[in-house]
Amino acid sequence: MSMSPKHTTPFSVSDILSPLEESYKKVGMEGGGLGAPLAAYRQGQAAPPTAAMQQHAVGHHGAVTAAYHMTAAGVPQLSHSAVGGYCNGNLGNMSELPPYQDTMRNSASGPGWYGANPDPRFPAISRFMGPASGMNMSGMGGLGSLGDVSKNMAPLPSAPRRKRRVLFSQAQVYELERRFKQQKYLSAPEREHLASMIHLTPTQVKIWFQNHRYKMKRQAKDKAAQQQLQQDSGGGGGGGGTGCPQQQQAQQQSPRRVAVPVLVKDGKPCQAGAPAPGAASLQGHAQQQAQHQAQAAQAAAAAISVGSGGAGLGAHPGHQPGSAGQSPDLAHHAASPAALQGQVSSLSHLNSSGSDYGTMSCSTLLYGRTW
């Protein structure tokens, strides 16, 4: 059996639709009710498909067509006249149609729906095509109880919806802050009076004051913690300024900075009137050295004078302090400490003159008036 049509159809819209129009015209001309089609429908339902199976039992192509004809014979088909009557609105004999469910059950149980193993080459399909494959509607009654159970179940308690946040105006916030600066806690009459002034409820005023008190306490706590942290960091920095012994040793071992006089600057000798940079520091250093030398000389002179006085006294033990004729100088020095002080002052005068000479020599070195 060839599946290709005998005549090819052009691809225009009018040529494609023309066969449908002709079939509708034929259906309209036939007319009639649904009585004759229903009789044909019932006869076709009871007709066994054995002739079609015997005709197409040879070959693979024959088996396919046998299944096709078997299905066509078992499944009820409506003729064109029945379709035309339905389309034209002739529904007078629709009451004679049997229910679809009964038709399906009768056709499934009868031999017209599934044959007794039409082809031995398809034994596996027969177990899927038994009478038990029909829809069992008796077990569907349990689904109705699910609806009753769902109705009897209590609805789950939904979470309470949070109220929308009320935003205060700038004037209300200003008045609340001004009153908070004056008084952090309000009594009930004061709260009601303030709420009536700014058009709020006493509960809103109460909650605002509670939140603002908590906010101010938290800010003060954060500020105190920040100050404490700054103090700790400052103390750590001050303690670090002293340094450990290793750092002190490193500073002591590092070379000192010594001021060096500048004799020539930019290829020209420096003038005597214009001291070079660092001259003041160098001059102060020279003065300090001169003072140290003078103090050392004073100490040495005092030690010498005291030693000579003691030796004189030990060499002449028989002499009394009154015998000033033999050694008047020694007696005078031993008797009066003021004389020793005068001698030390004379030595200090000499040292001061020596320091002046040192400063002069340093200045000559500094200003380039060299030797």
UniProtKB/Swiss-Prot annotation:
Single GO biological process annotation from the record: response to hormone
GO cellular component, one term: chromatin
Quaternary structure and partners: Interacts with WWTR1.
Protein's name according to its UniProt entry: Homeobox protein Nkx-2.1
UniProt keyword Transcription regulation present: yes
Underlying gene: NKX2-1
DNA-binding region: 161-220
SMART domains associated with the record: HOX
Compositional bias annotation for Low complexity: 244-253, 272-294
Record PTM text: Phosphorylated on serine residues by STK3/MST2.
Top-level taxonomy: Eukaryota, Metazoa, Chordata, Craniata, Vertebrata
Function: Transcription factor that binds and activates the promoter of thyroid specific genes such as thyroglobulin, thyroperoxidase, and thyrotropin receptor. Crucial in the maintenance of the thyroid differentiation phenotype. May play a role in lung development and surfactant homeostasis. Forms a regulatory loop with GRHL2 that coordinates lung epithelial cell morphogenesis and differentiation. Activates the transcription of GNRHR and plays a role in enhancing the circadian oscillation of its gene expression. Represses the transcription of the circadian transcriptional repressor NR1D1.
Expression sites (tissue/organ): Thyroid and lung.
Organism from which the protein derives: Homo sapiens (Human)
Record-listed Phosphoserine modification sites: S254
Subcellular location: Nucleus
Bias (Gly residues) ranges: 233-243
